[in-house]
């Protein structure tokens, strides 16, 4: 199965994506992860991405889609993949669709995780992030130590996790994502809206039910 995840920051799509990927035995492919891997490996597309980042520019969609195509063509993705953070704009949605057609891989579903804005502010303003591994934590305080990923780092509260910054990010998210949702609706894609308020298990149950996975 090829599944695209959409949703605002703090909606839990990354966590649910990991759980879904484990259940389906497919990789969760996140744009940031594959970009960093391509840059580290020094692939031709990775070098193009690095050049753009070194200039302070956004990495071109064509480069991102090229890297995503390589990831989806890998043996590990033979059974499918969960795509997180891949689609943020309508050109990216169209580019991904064209790429999947070229690969002969159907898009099975687009999961849209929905959460009330006040709940997102509550969640994210209580989030800390490890300076070393960038893993987010909820319910832990700045200054605590993280030992995930084989490294030791300090937990910090990022400036963009302050309430005003969160509301600004939500405004940007709505402006970007509303056209994407409309594009998927017009394209006839299997767009599934998921109520993302509840425990991990409750939200996971809704995802599995929507996808008819037992």
Swiss-Prot record:
InterPro entries listed in its UniProt record: Adenyl_kin_sub (IPR006259), Adenylat/UMP-CMP_kin (IPR000850), P-loop_NTPase (IPR027417)
Gene Ontology CC annotation, any one: cytoplasm
Pathway assignment: Purine metabolism; AMP biosynthesis via salvage pathway; AMP from ADP: step 1/1
Catalysis: reaction(s): AMP + ATP = 2 ADP
Highest taxon of the lineage: Bacteria
Primary site of residence: cytoplasm
SUPFAM superfamilies tied to this protein: P-loop containing nucleoside triphosphate hydrolases
Signal peptide residue numbers: none
Family matches, as Gene3D superfamilies: P-loop containing nucleotide triphosphate hydrolases
Region annotated LID, chain positions: 126-161
Alphabetic keyword roster: ATP-binding, Cytoplasm, Kinase, Nucleotide biosynthesis, Nucleotide-binding, Transferase
Biological role: Catalyzes the reversible transfer of the terminal phosphate group between ATP and AMP. Plays an important role in cellular energy homeostasis and in adenine nucleotide metabolism.
PANTHER family: NUCLEOTIDE KINASE
Annotated HAMAP family: Adenylate_kinase_Adk
Domain notes: Consists of three domains, a large central CORE domain and two small peripheral domains, NMPbind and LID, which undergo movements during catalysis. The LID domain closes over the site of phosphoryl transfer upon ATP binding. Assembling and dissambling the active center during each catalytic cycle provides an effective means to prevent ATP hydrolysis.
Name recorded for this polypeptide: Adenylate kinase
Originating species: Gemmatimonas aurantiaca (strain DSM 14586 / JCM 11422 / NBRC 100505 / T-27)
Lineage: Bacteria, Pseudomonadati, Gemmatimonadota, Gemmatimonadia, Gemmatimonadales
